[in-house]
């Protein structure tokens, strides 16, 4: 299908009625017309199931465009566009000069032609007024201008016409159903917010489209973004669009189908944390669906810096993670409904808490939603997951917050599980969702609702919960003083690294309220996990330090629960949970020693010949096994010491090999210990070892001997608490596959969680990663200067582009957006500072380990196994004898030198010239 003009012989304007959707008849007369369709020559990832050459009446030899807008931009016969090349549209695979394809024939290539490279520099150039590839010619076009009145004389809010292809992609039943004069589907609204989020109010002249249309917002879906690529962003955004379609398609809903269409009760808000870190390819994707346009942002308004750029549009378009464009084709259940979208692009990078302040304090207070769902870019919500989250709030009036199940992205055919780190994280996520989250949900207090996939009732978090939460926003540090981030001690700063835990505690402990938190198993989200050791360590540093500090905070302030409105039963279980959390914190604190002692004890039980094991050693015999165990123990302690050396002075990315080697060594040791433990179990049940159970004096005596056992009983308990409990719980939840695909890898990596991650986290407790990055990309944006019209109204002059130019620029944008994503190759080159630190680390490591090796060889009885003929006592005695003689020789040597110098100077003094 292609869009045809209507036959008007005047240039298309903003309210152009042309480009209506029509079926093209078969025949070669329309071959050239079809070839001029948007991206019609693309193949590969652009080809989709809706594009059948037979259905489209195109030649089978001609590659067809999948999931693309097939808008033609050919002008009518009576209208000549002086900037039209007259040829076919510049396609994704053609070798044409873009200056010729989009500009005046014969004109040299414009610097804006580099927009096709999707580089940051090209994006900067497109921000110039009229410079978004306008016509593609060399030099800027001169456009007519229009005067835009500022709201209350200070707020710049402008409506910009969207490309014809986007307008026409909206189904007619929605376009024709709006009130007269509505520009919801024809214009994108841009607002330059020059204020703090707390001042983004109706009183100050700011407003949002859903409120302007008097719509009730039931569900506000927020996507926070930092620097993710367009594949990750499209994965989240397209998943949200599909979930909204699931809600709109509900047939027998008591709520969504009353009081207006369901899609009008849902708003999607994207909050980007700064222009500088933002991937500019993502902006092309957003422009393709209509929620962003190049060249409209203003750096400041009359010298007052813009804090956030806010775009609003209602669209039916979506881009998949494979860069395929989805548009409405019929009224079937697979068609996406209109989605009210807001895009907030913060001018400077000011961290995630500030993004949430824009969401809750600025947009939330105007829209007043019932439920807010928080997603991170890269998290893909599963089928009907957002509906399941909302239903939890709808069915429980006291539910203040909820989260779904987050699982690791495993790739096609679960191929990511080949990486042991990914498999270990997959198992960790699964067990957390099977054991930890349901337990905490039963108590009513889930200690952490992951910021990547969670939901809150808006009125539940209003007040103190958000006030405490926003103390971590460094942009409020001057206003808050000592209560702000700059006035906090290092413990509180670490606490705000796990800001979602703070919000959870404050919500449950809210005075006079009885809000509780819950886990919704039916809601699932998929997220990518770190695949490299360096990235994994850096991520867990923030998680571990933040969660530990927040956990201590919740225990210390548990008394605030008594001011809440929870009933006595809930309070009883909250006390039980507090005791459980206290016990878990103590176990975590001593986990470093616990792992070492467990490793050492199991190896001694199995490898040291004694009467209990029949004077044998497993697995290498009674002679070799003690030697191997001694080597393993010293390797364990040596690499544990290495972790402190690395953590106190190196970046993980600067010590990739050292950390990778540490993971491998600890993994091998852990697997060796697991084999030893299984050997103990086999011996206990095979009769090779005596069973110290009382089976002759009744059940009570048996239980007493079982739980008091120091042999087989304790082994069985440990076995049941790990292998057995995990297997049983996983099968009960009918989700056991991780036990077969990820459990072995998790067992290998488990000790590294303590010996590497915890050591690095605690060694870098001082690193709270606050502060902002410099933002120089905003310099490319133009300023807005106001004038007084008639001495009264404040206006600005804004470029008034013809619709034909908007459409031609859009075609270049779509081509960039739908270009297959190629992941950049990350450079592992060390910086000069990293190389200096690496040398220091090697020097200190060699110094410490060489000294430790000598001390061990002299004093330890364990090295007797290596064939030393004398005992440790004899070696120590001889070492001290050698040391004393060495010091005596050195002292004597120094004394001889001093005497020689004294005698020489005395003699020479007699012969010196006067």
UniProtKB/Swiss-Prot annotation:
Region of interest (Disordered), residue spans: 1-67, 112-140
Pfam family, one: Chitin_synth_1
Localization per Swiss-Prot or TrEMBL: Cell membrane
EC main group: transferase
UniProt KW Electron transport keyword: no
Known EC number: 2.4.1.16
Biological function: Polymerizes chitin, a structural polymer of the cell wall and septum, by transferring the sugar moiety of UDP-GlcNAc to the non-reducing end of the growing chitin polymer. Plays an important role in septal growth or maintenance. Mediates colony spore formation.
Family: Belongs to the chitin synthase family. Class III subfamily.
Full protein name: Chitin synthase B
């Amino acid at each position: 299908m292609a869009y045809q003009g209507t036959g008007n012989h005047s240039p298309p304007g903003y309210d152009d009625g042309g480009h209506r959707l029509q079926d093209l008849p078969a025949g070669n007369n329309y071959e050239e017309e079809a070839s001029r369709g948007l991206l019609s020559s693309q193949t590969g990832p652009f080809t989709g199931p809706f594009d059948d050459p037979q259905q489209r009446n195109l030649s089978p030899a001609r590659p067809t465009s999948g999931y693309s807008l097939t808008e033609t931009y050919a002008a009518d016969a009576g209208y000549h566009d002086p900037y039209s090349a007259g040829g076919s549209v510049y396609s994704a695979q053609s070798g044409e000069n873009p200056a010729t394809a989009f500009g005046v024939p014969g004109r040299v290539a414009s610097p804006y032609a580099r927009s096709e490279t999707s580089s940051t520099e090209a994006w900067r150039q497109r921000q110039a007024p009229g410079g978004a590839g306008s016509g593609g010619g060399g030099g800027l076009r001169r456009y007519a201008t229009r005067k835009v009145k500022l709201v209350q004389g200070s707020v710049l809010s402008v409506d910009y016409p969207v490309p014809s292809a986007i307008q026409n992609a909206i189904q007619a039943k929605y376009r024709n159903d709006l009130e007269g004069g509505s520009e919801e589907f024809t214009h994108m609204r841009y607002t330059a917010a020059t204020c703090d989020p707390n001042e983004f109010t109706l009183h100050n002249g700011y407003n949002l489209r859903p409120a302007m249309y008097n719509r009730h917002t039931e569900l506000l879906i927020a996507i926070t973004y930092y620097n993710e690529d367009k594949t990750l962003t499209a994965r989240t955004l397209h998943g949200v669009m599909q979930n909204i379609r699931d809600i709109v398609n509900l047939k027998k809903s008591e709520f969504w189908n009353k009081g207006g269409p369901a899609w009008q009760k849902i708003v999607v808000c994207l909050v980007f944390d700064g222009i500088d870190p933002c991937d500019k390819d993502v902006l092309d994707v957003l422009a393709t669906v209509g929620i962003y346009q190049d060249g409209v942002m203003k750096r400041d308004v009359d010298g007052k810096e813009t804090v956030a750029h806010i775009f609003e549009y209602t669209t039916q378009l979506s881009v998949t993670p494979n860069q395929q464009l989805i548009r409405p084709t019929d009224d079937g259940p697979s068609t996406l409904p209109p989605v009210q979208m807001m895009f907030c692009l913060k001018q400077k990078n000011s961290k995630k808490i500030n993004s949430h302040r824009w969401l809750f304090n600025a947009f939330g207070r105007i829209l007043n939603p019932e439920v807010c769902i928080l997603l991170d870019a890269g998290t893909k919500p599963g089928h009907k997951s957002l509906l399941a989250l909302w239903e939890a709030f709808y069915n429980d009036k006291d539910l203040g917050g909820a989260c779904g199940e987050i699982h690791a992205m495993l790739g096609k055919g679960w191929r990511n599980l080949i990486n042991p780190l990914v498999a270990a994280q997959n198992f960790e996520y699964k067990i957390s969702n099977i054991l930890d989250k349901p337990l905490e949900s039963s108590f009513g207090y889930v200690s952490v609702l992951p910021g990547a996939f969670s939901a809150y009732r808006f009125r539940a978090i209003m007040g103190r919960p958000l006030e405490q939460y926003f103390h971590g926003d460094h942009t409020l540090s001057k206003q808050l003083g000592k209560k702000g981030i700059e006035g906090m001690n290092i413990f509180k700063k670490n606490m705000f690294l796990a800001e979602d835990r703070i919000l959870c505690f404050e919500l449950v402990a809210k005075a006079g309220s009885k809000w509780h938190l819950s886990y919704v198993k039916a809601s699932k989200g998929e997220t990518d996990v770190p695949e490299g050791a360096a990235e994994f360590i850096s991520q867990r540093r923030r998680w571990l330090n933040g969660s530990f500090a927040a956990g201590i905070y919740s225990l210390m302030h548990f008394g605030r629960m008594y001011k809440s409105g929870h009933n006595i039963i809930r309070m009883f279980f909250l006390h039980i949970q507090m005791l459980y959390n206290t016990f878990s914190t103590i176990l975590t604190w001593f986990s470093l020693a616990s792992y070492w002692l467990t490793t050492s004890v199991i190896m001694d039980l199995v490898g040291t010949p004694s009467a209990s094991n029949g004077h044998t050693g497993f697995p290498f015999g009674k002679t070799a096994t003690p030697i191997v165990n001694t080597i393993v123990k010293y390797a364990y302690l040596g690499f544990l010491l290495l972790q402190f050396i690395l953590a106190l002075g190196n970046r993980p990315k600067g010590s990739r090999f050292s950390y990778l080697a540490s993971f491998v060594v600890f993994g091998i040791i852990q697997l060796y210990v697991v084999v030893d433990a299984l050997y103990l179990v086999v011996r206990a049940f095979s009769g090779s070892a005596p069973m110290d159970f009382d089976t002759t004096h009744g059940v009570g005596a048996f239980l007493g001997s079982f739980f008091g056992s120091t042999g087989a009983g304790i082994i069985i308990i440990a076995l049941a608490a790990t292998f057995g409990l995990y297997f049983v719980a996983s099968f009960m939840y009918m989700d056991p596959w991780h036990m077969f695909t990820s459990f072995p890898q998790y067992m290998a990596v488990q000790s590294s969680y303590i010996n590497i991650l915890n050591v690095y986290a605690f060694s870098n407790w001082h690193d709270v990663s606050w502060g902002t990055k410099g933002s120089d990309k905003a310099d490319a944006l133009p300023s807005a200067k106001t004038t007084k019209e008639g001495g009264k109204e404040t206006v600005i002059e804004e470029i008034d582009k013809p619709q034909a130019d908007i459409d031609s620029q859009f075609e270049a944008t779509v081509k960039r957006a739908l270009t297959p994503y190629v992941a950049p190759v990350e450079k592992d080159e060390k910086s000069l500072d990293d190389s200096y630190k690496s040398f220091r680390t090697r020097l200190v490591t060699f110094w410490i380990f060489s000294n430790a090796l000598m001390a061990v060889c002299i004093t330890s009885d364990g090295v007797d196994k290596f064939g030393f003929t004398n005992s440790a006592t004899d070696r120590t005695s001889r070492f001290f004898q050698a040391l004393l003689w060495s010091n005596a020789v050195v002292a004597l040597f120094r004394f001889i030198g001093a005497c020689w110098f004294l005698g020489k100077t005395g003699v020479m003094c007699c012969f010196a010239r006067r």
